Design a protein with these regions (language model features):
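Amphipathic alpha-helical segments that form the core helices of the histone-fold
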Residues: 170-178, 189-195
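Glycine-rich, flexible loop segments associated with nucleotide phosphate handling
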Residues: 29-33, 164-169
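An accessory alpha-helical subdomain
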Residues: 114, 118-120, 126-165, 173-176, ...
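Glycine-centered secondary-structure boundary/capping sites
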Residues: 25-27, 107, 157-160, 170, ...
Protein backbone atom coordinates (compact mmCIF):
# COMPACT_ATOMS: atom_id res chain seq x y z
CA UNK A 1 0.00 0.00 0.00
CA UNK A 2 3.02 2.32 0.10
CA UNK A 3 2.24 3.66 -3.38
CA UNK A 4 -1.21 4.88 -2.33
CA UNK A 5 -1.14 8.38 -0.89
CA UNK A 6 -4.71 8.12 0.43
CA UNK A 7 -4.09 5.03 2.59
CA UNK A 8 -2.73 5.13 6.13
CA UNK A 9 -1.90 1.89 7.94
CA UNK A 10 -2.29 2.18 11.71
CA UNK A 11 -0.85 -0.73 13.68
CA UNK A 12 -2.94 -0.62 16.87
CA UNK A 13 -5.23 -2.81 18.98
CA UNK A 14 -8.79 -1.65 18.22
CA UNK A 15 -9.88 -2.62 21.74
CA UNK A 16 -7.30 -0.26 23.25
CA UNK A 17 -6.79 2.57 20.77
CA UNK A 18 -8.72 5.85 21.13
CA UNK A 19 -10.92 5.64 18.04
CA UNK A 20 -12.39 9.09 18.60
CA UNK A 21 -8.89 10.56 18.50
CA UNK A 22 -8.05 8.64 15.31
CA UNK A 23 -11.22 9.88 13.60
CA UNK A 24 -10.42 13.42 14.69
CA UNK A 25 -6.83 13.17 13.49
CA UNK A 26 -7.35 11.39 10.17
CA UNK A 27 -10.90 12.37 9.17
CA UNK A 28 -11.37 15.77 10.83
CA UNK A 29 -13.99 14.25 13.13
CA UNK A 30 -16.37 13.46 10.27
CA UNK A 31 -18.33 10.18 10.45
CA UNK A 32 -16.45 7.16 9.15
CA UNK A 33 -17.52 3.85 7.64
CA UNK A 34 -16.15 0.75 9.32
CA UNK A 35 -15.53 -2.21 6.98
CA UNK A 36 -13.88 -5.28 8.49
CA UNK A 37 -13.52 -9.03 8.69
CA UNK A 38 -13.51 -9.21 12.48
CA UNK A 39 -11.91 -11.90 14.63
CA UNK A 40 -15.03 -13.82 15.64
CA UNK A 41 -14.07 -14.17 19.30
CA UNK A 42 -13.95 -10.38 19.86
CA UNK A 43 -16.79 -9.29 17.57
CA UNK A 44 -19.08 -8.08 20.35
CA UNK A 45 -16.46 -6.07 22.32
CA UNK A 46 -15.37 -4.30 19.13
CA UNK A 47 -18.89 -3.37 18.02
CA UNK A 48 -20.02 -2.29 21.48
CA UNK A 49 -16.80 -0.32 22.00
CA UNK A 50 -17.46 1.67 18.83
CA UNK A 51 -21.07 2.36 19.81
CA UNK A 52 -20.68 2.98 23.54
CA UNK A 53 -17.71 5.31 23.04
CA UNK A 54 -19.82 7.30 20.57
CA UNK A 55 -17.27 7.06 17.77
CA UNK A 56 -18.64 9.08 14.81
CA UNK A 57 -19.72 6.29 12.47
CA UNK A 58 -22.23 6.29 9.62
CA UNK A 59 -22.19 2.52 9.10
CA UNK A 60 -20.43 -0.70 10.06
CA UNK A 61 -20.15 -3.47 7.45
CA UNK A 62 -18.54 -6.59 8.84
CA UNK A 63 -18.23 -10.32 8.34
CA UNK A 64 -19.06 -12.19 11.50
CA UNK A 65 -20.20 -15.62 12.60
CA UNK A 66 -23.69 -16.29 11.17
CA UNK A 67 -25.10 -16.96 14.62
CA UNK A 68 -23.92 -13.55 15.83
CA UNK A 69 -25.33 -11.78 12.77
CA UNK A 70 -28.69 -13.44 13.42
CA UNK A 71 -28.63 -12.32 17.06
CA UNK A 72 -28.09 -8.72 16.01
CA UNK A 73 -31.33 -8.46 14.05
CA UNK A 74 -33.86 -10.72 15.80
CA UNK A 75 -36.81 -9.52 17.89
CA UNK A 76 -38.43 -10.47 21.22
CA UNK A 77 -39.54 -14.01 21.93
CA UNK A 78 -36.86 -15.75 19.88
CA UNK A 79 -34.06 -17.89 21.33
CA UNK A 80 -31.36 -15.68 19.76
CA UNK A 81 -32.82 -12.45 21.18
CA UNK A 82 -30.64 -10.94 23.87
CA UNK A 83 -28.56 -8.04 25.12
CA UNK A 84 -26.58 -7.84 21.86
CA UNK A 85 -29.80 -7.63 19.79
CA UNK A 86 -31.09 -4.73 21.87
CA UNK A 87 -27.80 -2.85 21.99
CA UNK A 88 -27.24 -3.05 18.23
CA UNK A 89 -30.85 -2.10 17.47
CA UNK A 90 -30.63 0.89 19.82
CA UNK A 91 -27.69 2.34 17.91
CA UNK A 92 -28.23 1.09 14.35
CA UNK A 93 -30.47 -0.61 11.79
CA UNK A 94 -29.02 -4.10 11.13
CA UNK A 95 -29.38 -5.94 7.82
CA UNK A 96 -27.69 -9.15 6.68
CA UNK A 97 -26.20 -8.46 3.24
CA UNK A 98 -24.92 -11.95 2.42
CA UNK A 99 -24.53 -15.38 3.93
CA UNK A 100 -21.06 -16.89 3.52
CA UNK A 101 -21.01 -20.71 3.77
CA UNK A 102 -18.04 -22.63 5.21
CA UNK A 103 -16.97 -23.92 1.78
CA UNK A 104 -15.91 -20.37 0.85
CA UNK A 105 -12.91 -20.72 3.18
CA UNK A 106 -9.75 -22.79 3.20
CA UNK A 107 -9.39 -24.51 5.56
CA UNK A 108 -13.14 -24.94 5.94
CA UNK A 109 -14.42 -23.65 9.32
CA UNK A 110 -17.06 -25.41 11.41
CA UNK A 111 -19.37 -22.38 11.46
CA UNK A 112 -21.15 -20.32 8.83
CA UNK A 113 -20.49 -16.62 8.37
CA UNK A 114 -22.48 -13.60 7.26
CA UNK A 115 -21.84 -10.05 6.13
CA UNK A 116 -24.03 -7.67 8.10
CA UNK A 117 -24.42 -3.92 7.77
CA UNK A 118 -25.30 -1.70 10.71
CA UNK A 119 -26.50 1.72 9.57
CA UNK A 120 -26.14 4.15 12.46
CA UNK A 121 -29.23 6.07 13.53
CA UNK A 122 -28.89 9.84 13.72
CA UNK A 123 -31.12 9.60 16.79
CA UNK A 124 -31.92 6.39 18.70
CA UNK A 125 -35.38 4.94 17.94
CA UNK A 126 -36.39 5.28 21.61
CA UNK A 127 -36.02 8.09 24.12
CA UNK A 128 -34.17 7.08 27.28
CA UNK A 129 -33.05 9.37 30.11
CA UNK A 130 -30.18 7.17 31.32
CA UNK A 131 -28.52 4.91 28.72
CA UNK A 132 -26.22 3.22 31.22
CA UNK A 133 -29.15 2.29 33.45
CA UNK A 134 -31.08 0.88 30.49
CA UNK A 135 -28.17 -1.35 29.47
CA UNK A 136 -27.70 -2.53 33.07
CA UNK A 137 -31.39 -3.49 33.09
CA UNK A 138 -31.00 -5.31 29.78
CA UNK A 139 -27.93 -7.25 30.92
CA UNK A 140 -29.62 -8.19 34.20
CA UNK A 141 -32.72 -9.38 32.33
CA UNK A 142 -30.74 -11.78 30.15
CA UNK A 143 -28.16 -12.99 32.67
CA UNK A 144 -30.87 -15.30 34.03
CA UNK A 145 -33.19 -15.35 31.04
CA UNK A 146 -35.40 -18.20 32.31
CA UNK A 147 -36.33 -16.24 35.43
CA UNK A 148 -39.13 -13.69 35.52
CA UNK A 149 -38.03 -10.11 34.97
CA UNK A 150 -38.75 -9.26 38.62
CA UNK A 151 -36.44 -12.01 39.91
CA UNK A 152 -33.77 -11.34 37.31
CA UNK A 153 -33.57 -7.67 38.25
CA UNK A 154 -33.85 -8.31 42.00
CA UNK A 155 -30.96 -10.82 41.96
CA UNK A 156 -28.70 -8.76 39.72
CA UNK A 157 -25.29 -7.63 40.96
CA UNK A 158 -25.52 -4.56 38.71
CA UNK A 159 -28.71 -3.15 40.24
CA UNK A 160 -29.79 -2.30 43.76
CA UNK A 161 -33.55 -1.91 43.37
CA UNK A 162 -35.88 -3.60 45.85
CA UNK A 163 -38.64 -5.95 44.75
CA UNK A 164 -41.17 -3.26 45.62
CA UNK A 165 -39.37 -0.67 43.46
CA UNK A 166 -39.16 -3.13 40.58
CA UNK A 167 -42.86 -3.96 40.76
CA UNK A 168 -43.73 -0.25 41.00
CA UNK A 169 -41.70 0.61 37.89
CA UNK A 170 -43.24 -2.31 36.00
CA UNK A 171 -46.75 -1.26 37.02
CA UNK A 172 -46.08 2.30 35.84
CA UNK A 173 -45.02 1.03 32.42
CA UNK A 174 -47.80 -1.57 32.12
CA UNK A 175 -45.42 -4.55 32.10
CA UNK A 176 -46.88 -7.70 33.74
CA UNK A 177 -44.97 -8.90 36.83
CA UNK A 178 -44.76 -12.48 35.51
CA UNK A 179 -43.08 -11.56 32.21
CA UNK A 180 -39.55 -12.63 31.28
CA UNK A 181 -37.01 -10.15 29.97
CA UNK A 182 -36.77 -11.96 26.63
CA UNK A 183 -40.37 -10.86 25.88
CA UNK A 184 -39.69 -7.10 26.17
CA UNK A 185 -39.12 -4.83 23.19
CA UNK A 186 -36.47 -2.12 23.08
CA UNK A 187 -39.20 0.49 23.64
CA UNK A 188 -40.38 -1.35 26.78
CA UNK A 189 -36.85 -1.52 28.17
CA UNK A 190 -36.50 2.23 27.53
CA UNK A 191 -39.80 2.95 29.31
CA UNK A 192 -38.77 0.74 32.22
CA UNK A 193 -35.38 2.46 32.50
CA UNK A 194 -37.09 5.85 32.53
CA UNK A 195 -39.44 4.68 35.30
CA UNK A 196 -36.50 3.40 37.39
CA UNK A 197 -34.60 6.62 36.75
CA UNK A 198 -37.42 8.60 38.39
CA UNK A 199 -37.27 6.45 41.53
CA UNK A 200 -33.80 7.62 42.55
Amino acid sequence: LKDWDNVTVINEDILKVDMNQLVKEYNQGRPIKVVANLPYYITTPIIMGLFENHVPISSITIMVQKEVADRMQVGPGTKDYGALSLAVQYYARPQIIANVPPNCFMPRPKVGSAVIQLVRYEEPPVQVDNEKLMFRLIRASFNQRRKTLVNGLKNSQELDFSKEEIEKAMAETGIPVNVRGEALTLAEFADLANAFNKLR
